[in-house]
Amino acid sequence: MSGPAQVPMMSPNGSVPPIYVPPGYAPQVIEDNGVRRVVVVPQAPEFHPGGHTVLHRSPHPPLPGFIPVPTMMPPPPRHMYSPVTGAGDMTTQYMPQYQSSQVYGDVDAHSTHGRSNFRDERSSKTYERLQKKLKDRQGTQKDKMSSPPSSPQKCPSPINEHNGLIKGQNAGGINTGSAKIKSGKGKGGTQVDTEIEEKDEETKAFEALLSNIVKPVASDIQARTVVLTWSPPSSLINGETDESSVPELYGYEVLISSTGKDGKYKSVYIGEETNITLNDLKPATDYHAKVQAEYNSIKGTPSEAEIFTTLSCEPDIPNPPRIANRTKNSLTLQWKAPSDNGSKIQNFVLEWDEGKGNGEFYQCYMGSQKQFKITKLSPAMGCKFRLSARNDYGTSGFSEEVLYYTSGCAPSMPASPVLTKAGITWLSLQWSKPSGTPSDEGISYILEMEEETSGYGFKPKYDGEDLAYTVKNLRRSTKYKFKVIAYNSEGKSNPSEVVEFTTCPDKPGIPVKPSVKGKIHSHSFKITWDPPKDNGGAAINKYVVEMAEGSNGNKWEMIYSGATREHLCDRLNPGCFYRLRVYCISDGGQSAVSESLLVQTPAVPPGPCLPPRLQGRPKAKEIQLRWGPPLVDGGSPISCYSVEMSPIEKDEPREVYQGSEVECTVSSLLPGKTYSFRLRAANKMGFGPFSEKCDITTAPGPPDQCKPPQVTCRSATCAQVNWEVPLSNGTDVTEYRLEWGGVEGSMQICYCGPGLNYEIKGLSPATTYYCRVQALSVVGAGPFSEVVACVTPPSVPGIVTCLQEISDDEIENPHYSPSTCLAISWEKPCDHGSEILAYSIDSGDKQSLTVGKVTSYIINNLQPDTTYRIRIQALNSLGAGPFSHVIKLKTKPLPPDPPRLECVAFSHQNLKLKWGEGTPKTLSTDSIQYHLQMEDKNGRFVSLYRGPCHTYKVQRLNESTSYKFCIQACNEAGEGPVSQEYIFTTPKSVPAALKAPKIEKVNDHICEITWECLQPMKGDPVIYSLQVMLGKDSEFKQIYKGPDSSFRYSSLQLNCEYRFRVCAIRQCQDSLGHQDLVGPYSTTVLFISQRTEPPASTNRDTVESTRTRRALSDEQCAAVNLVLFAFFSILIAFIIQYFVIK
C-alpha cells in the first residue's frame, strides 16, 4: 500500500465499525455530503518541536478488531455508550478501553490478561490519586460521568464527536499538524495535555480495580441448573485498601461457554446481584463461566473461567414416530433416538390406542430397535401412536400423538355442494361425505369452480378435509358453477353434479349532495338531488331524505321516501338552521348517506312575553321580578328585555330595567304600596309587543338591629347572656335567635325563643367564646348585632390520653430491666388555663407515684413475670384531673443462665459441641435461643451459631490447636450472662491411606515389595509398616517397620498364597512424649509363589502364564471393587424404592 486508500463502510447505527489497519498505517475518518469514508494513509513520522508534547504511538501491534485511531479523542457521552453483546467477540474485551478518555495516552495491549500483579509503581500512585479524587467528587460523580469532559479552551481545529469516534474533515491530520498550530501557546497546551493524561491514568487505574475479580464459584449443580456466586472486585493495592473510595454497587456480566475454555462465550446475565441461578442448561455438559465487573460504563477484564459439569438425567422427549410403509393390514413405523443426556438409551417404548380412538394407550413394543411393524390391521383403519425413551436415570415423557391410517379403497361420488350463505364477493358452500364411507376414514375434497364469462372451464378452489368452504374474491351479481371431488390415498371419486349459484348485488354508491331549488321562505323551501354514479349492480328502488334541526344537530328524522328526486320542506320555524341529507336503497342494500346541506330560514321579531312574576316574598322597600323568554323568538336569539313600572293610582309608566337577564330587583319602593309592571322582548329584528300588566304590593319591614348582648360567666363551664328589645318597624318581635361559638366566623344557634336571656352550660375552662343576637317578626329577620367575646375562668386539667407501653427497642436507659421495670408514655392533656405541675401514676399499689412535668416514665422495683393495672391523672394548681383509661402491662421473666458447654466428638479439623438438655434438632419455635462464640486470632470472640439447637459442629479447624469458646442463652426477657471460657484442642491428623503396594518376584524364594512415599507432615517424620498374611492364616504379621519405601521378603515358600498390605505411621513428639499415629492400611495384594522352570513346550508356557496371572494388579482390584460397589448401590436403591417409598 503505497498511498492513501478509501475503504467504503456501512454501519447500521451511524458509528464507524472497527477495522484492522496494517502496521505503519493509520485510518482517517472523512465526512463528505453526509457520507463517511475511512482513508488508510501511511503513518506520519514523529515530529518533536521544542517545548511541545510528543504524540507517541503504541509500542505494541494493534489488537484484532481494534482501530489505532489518533489518541486525541474525547470520551463518548455516557448515554451514547452501549456494551457490545456476544460472548466470544474480541471487541467485547477491548471496546471499554477504546471508549475510555485516552488523550495523548498509549494503548495498553496487556490490560486484558493481567490481574493485580501487573501494576507498576506509576499505576499504583495513579490509583492512590484516584481514590483521593473520588472522595472529593462523591456528591457530583454521577453528573460528571453522564456528560463528556470539556475540551481545552485553546483547541486549534474543530473536532466533532459521534458515538465515540472523531468526525470532521480535519480529523485525520491531527498527528502531523497539531504541533504547528499550537506554536506560541506551548504553556497552555502542555497544561491541558497533563490534565488529560492524568484522567487517562485514572481510568486505567479504575479498570485495574474492576479487573481484580476472582472467578465465580459453582454450587448446587443439577442437570439443567446451577448456582453461580462471586465476590466484588478486591480493593487491595500494594497491600493496602481504602474502603471509602470503593463504589458501593457494581454491575456484573456473566459469560458462559459450552465449547471449551477458549470457545465462544455468550452473556447470560447483566445486573447488580452477586449470585444467580442459571437455567435451561444441557445435561451432562462441561461449561466454563466467567464474570466481568462494570462501573459507570467502565468494564474490567473478565475473570478466570470456572469449570463445572451438569448432571445426567433421563432422555429428552423423542420426536413422534414416522410411517415408513403401509399396507391394508400393516403399518411400519420408524423413529430417531433423542438426546440421551449422559446415559445410553436402553429401550424405546411404543404405545398405540389399538385403533379404538378412546384415548387409552397400550404398549405394543419395547426394545432397543428404532422401527416396528404392526400387523393384523383392517383396511382404512386409523391408529394413534406415541413414543418414549428410557435410560439408567428414568423414562422420558411421551412424544406428540400421531394418527396413521392403513390403505383403503377410493371413495364414491359425493353429493353436489349446497349454498349455505351468499355475499357480494363470496359464496359459502357445504357438502357431505360420500355414502357408505366409514366415519373415521380420512377423506379429502377438491372444490372446483367455473365462471360463466371467463371461458377457462373449472378450476380448483379448495383442497382439504373440511366439509365447508367460503369462496372469496368473486364479482357481484355473477353466476358461478361448482362441483366437488372426493379422494383418499387409494384414488379419486367421480365429480359430483354441477350446481350454479349467484353472488349478491352490492349496495349503491353515495348520492350527490342535495341543493336548494328556488327561494328560501320563513316556513318552507324546496330541495333536489342527483342519483349516485354507481348503482351497485341493481336499479335504485327509492330515495330517503332525512332532516336534523340545528347547525350541529344529530337527531335525524325521515321527511321523505320515494322514487322522485325533489321534495318541499314545509312547516318550518323562522330563523332556524336545518341539515338535510339523502341516501338510496336497492336490492343490494342501503347506500351511505350523502353530504349534509345546511339551510337557515329568515327570522322575524319575537312574540309577546308572559307577564313578569314575583320572585320570592315582597319586601318593604324592594321587590324581585323574574320572567321567561317569549314562546316565539322569531327565529333569532333574544338579545334584550324591557320592564316598565307605574303606580296603581295613576298611569305614568317608566322603564326600570333594560338588559339581557331574565330577572331584576326594583328598589326604592314604599312599604305596603301596589305597583303595576309589564314586559317586552327584542331580537335583531326589533322589539315585540308588551305583555299584560302584573300588580304587586310591597310588604312591611323587619325589626332593626339589636344592641350587643351582655355576657356574665357564673363558673368555668356556665355563662349567662342578656339582651334588649330593638325597634320593630310596625310589627311585634316574635322571637330572638342567639348564636354561640368558639370561632368568630363559625357560630351556631344555641337559643331561639321570645326570652331576653339564656344560660349556656357545658363550656370548656379558660376558653374564648363569641356570641351575637338577632330579632325576628312575622315580616322577617333583622340584622345580627355586633359580636361580643368572653373568656371562661381556668379549671383542673383534662383527662390523660394515649397511655401506652414503650417498646424495649426505644429505651436507651442502661439501668432498664424488662423483668423489674415497665416503661410508659402518654400525651399531655389540656391544662384548662392552669399549667400542669405533675402527674400521679396508679399501678395498683397502696400509694400512687407522683412524677414531674414529663410524658414518659420508667416504673422500677416491680416483680418479674407479673401483671399490673396502670392509670394516670394530671395535677395543676386548681387540683387533680380525672384518671385515664386503665392499661394492663406485664413484666418479663428473668433471662436464663448459660448452659454447660461440652465437646462430644472431635477430629483434627472438626469439633462437635453440645450444651443443655435437648434433642440435637430442636424446633425453631423454642423460647430459649443460644449464642455460641469462638475466639479469633485477634483475641476477640466472634459469633458461630445463634439458634435453638443444642449441638453445633465447628469445621475447618487446624490440627493440634486449642480454641476458646463461650455460650450465652437468651429468651424474650433478654440476653443472659456469658458463660466461662471453655478450651478444646484438636488432635493431630493421621496419615492418609496408601495405594496398594506393588510386588515383583526376584526368584523362587525372594520378592520385592514397593509402595508410595509420603512427605513429612508438618515436620513430623513418616515411617511405614508392612504386614503379610500367609495361606489361610486369620491374622497379619508385621515383617517390616521403617522409613524405606521398599522391602525384600526372602521367606517365600513355593505354591503358597501371600497377602501384603502397608500403612503409614506419623511419629509425633510433644509434651507428653513420643507418639505414633497409625494411618489406615492400604488395599490387600495377593501374591502366589511358584517355581520358575525353563520353557518346555507351548502348552506348558500357556499353563504357567495362566498361573502367573492369578496375582491381581491394582487396576483389576479397582475394577472389581467398582463393580461390587455399583451392584450393592443398585440393590440398596431398589430396596428403598420398594419398601420405603411404595
Curated annotation (Swiss-Prot):
Any GO CC annotation of this UniProt entry: Golgi membrane
Function: Mediates spermatid-Sertoli adhesion during spermatogenesis.
Superkingdom: Eukaryota
One Pfam family per UniProt: fn3
Compositionally biased intervals (Low complexity): 146-158
Biased composition regions of type Basic and acidic residues, renumbered to the chain: 107-145
Name recorded for this polypeptide: Fibronectin type-III domain-containing protein 3A
Phosphoserine: residues bearing it: S147, S151, S157
Disordered: region residues: 104-191
Coiled coil spans: none
Topological category with respect to the lipid bilayer: Single-pass membrane protein
Record's keyword annotation contains Transferase: no
Family: Belongs to the FNDC3 family.
